[in-house]
Amino acid sequence: DTGVNLLEPGETPYENAQFLLFLCAVIKAVDDYQDLLRITVASAGNDHRLGANEAPPAIVSMFLGSDLSEILEAIEKDSPYDSHEKEVLRIGVHTLPKFQRDATDRNRTSPFAFTGNKFEFRMLGSSESISCANTVLNTSVAEELRQFADVLEEAEDFEVTLHELIRKTIAEHKRIIFNGDGYDASWVKEAEKRGLLNLRTTPDALAHLLDKKNV
């Protein structure tokens, strides 16, 4: 028994709902704790590496690929997925449209990339231990799932509440999703406009350890 991959898009409405819920937990965690993720890879050497040499930039963002991003946008707006679909996607009722693993998932400028059934966190330097990054990732996603559970366990209509929870999470945290070129100078300006952090150095990052949400 190898368990269940919770980030594997499913073949049934139930499996799709599970996938979307856990996907949203990861999206929310990366957005809420982008500072802590940057801290887990902070070192003098990595400060020089990030943003060059096929390494992602210091700005934390998530790559989902165009197909999955369009599906999330359709859910957020309660609109058809594309011009060929007349029916609005309902979580727990409909299956997701088939989508291919995006060929650009090899884009090394993405710090946190979805590659079909898993995420890759690409900011860690080769000489650094993965223990701190894993601890922050697992703990932050667990915290988001705890918040989701508090909402869903009180739901009178589970499917309606689940749909609204996922829709609300997408709307509030879509700023962290970026499928473009992380090396492009325009991304720095766009990230600032979105309210994302650009912690270029270790001292800049470490200061956020004392943020109230992180203590």
What are these regions (language model features)?
Residues 2-43:
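Catalytic or ion-translocation cores adjacent to nucleophile or general acid/base/metal-coordination motifs
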Residues 29-215:
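Acidic, glycine-enriched catalytic cores built around paired aspartates
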